[in-house]
Amino acid sequence: MSSLSVNTALAGGLTAGGLVAGASLANAPPSPMLESYYGTYQACSPMPSPLLLPSADDGRALEPLSPLGSDNEGDSRRRSRRARFHDAEDITTQLAQALKSSHRPDTSPLIEILPSLTHEQVMELRAEYKRLVKTGPERKGVNLAKHIRARLKDEDPLLMKASYSVALGRWESEAYWANFWYQGDKTRRELLIESLMGRTNGEIRLIKEAFTDKKYDNSLIKCMKEELKEDKFKKAVLMVLDERRMEEYDHYGRLQPIDYGLVDQDVADLRRAVRSEKGGETAMITIIVQRSDSHLRAILQEYERQFRANFARDALKKSGNLVGELLAHILNGVINRPVRDALLLHHAISASRKDGLRRELLISRLVRYHWDPDHMRAVKQAYRERYNRGLSDAVREATSGEWGMFCEELCIARTPPDVRRFDKISYSVR
């Protein structure tokens, strides 16, 4: 095996081995209508009503953040917390030591450290790891995420997926999940839907920039064009990747005014689409995928006011397939994102007990939510209110071993979200 070395005064001679839009949307074949897909939203309990939409500035539904040093949130096992002082060089030394040699890696540092880092800290750690940990006669820097994958893929595949996706960082992990589905069981389209749908144009841009796969010239668009078959689901995905979504804010960061004339037209078009005997998906995709959250929120409220019906449910009834799944994901996020994500976690926890292949859903969802501590806190509160139990307890019961411990760590909404840092200083004694 090749060997790695860490070039740091702290580590000394530490070594580590073991690294080994083509046609138009309207002309797309209507295959999703003919291909039933029993996905997440068809397996979940009813969605919340748009009448319960919280306003953007309504903070009454959220409890204040826990004081530093606690994250008890009602879970049965109280977690003691301590401030983590971030030192990328020290962490690099710990992780390289843990991953070294041909023996089973010491996974404790992975479990204790990786879930606690912000995206920015992960990026800093990856750069430091490549700078300090070298391999081969040419002393090339080692990619931390790839090192984790190489050392754990046979030892503990589930822990590998969880720790590898965190080590990729926020945006590359989404690119990983977006193209993960076609590498194995191609029925796991939720991984693709949840990585891309409902994102801002800026987020989509970051995900595309982070995508790496030489087979597709590091182009996520090329990957989707080649891997997805020609249907309206594919056209919806490419529409998202083309960054065609209405912007929520202007260049000065101000919320864009809602065009209520366009809202009325969209409501009429959507009503016509869900009531038509044939077709209708093209109109639904075009509107739901391309409108901003605030515009969609206005559509849902006006639709319910006019027709006393929940459009999200009507759309899922109309399209019991991939198109219905992607529309439901976007709309549920508009209605109430914390509740939607609590529902998705509950679904993943239940599904992973029955089907080992569905554990990727639980991992991907926990990794996604943990990057935003405030959102994770809101999700945990929504989970408790909806299911009358703590998220950490539910995850602990549904998982096992070290990957389960890693998932529990992802559930911790760390407050404050920024981690303390000590800068190295020098001083002299007179």
Task: Write out the residue ranges for each language-model feature.
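Structural signature for extended repeat/solenoid scaffolds and their inter-repeat hinge/linker regions
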Residues: 1-430
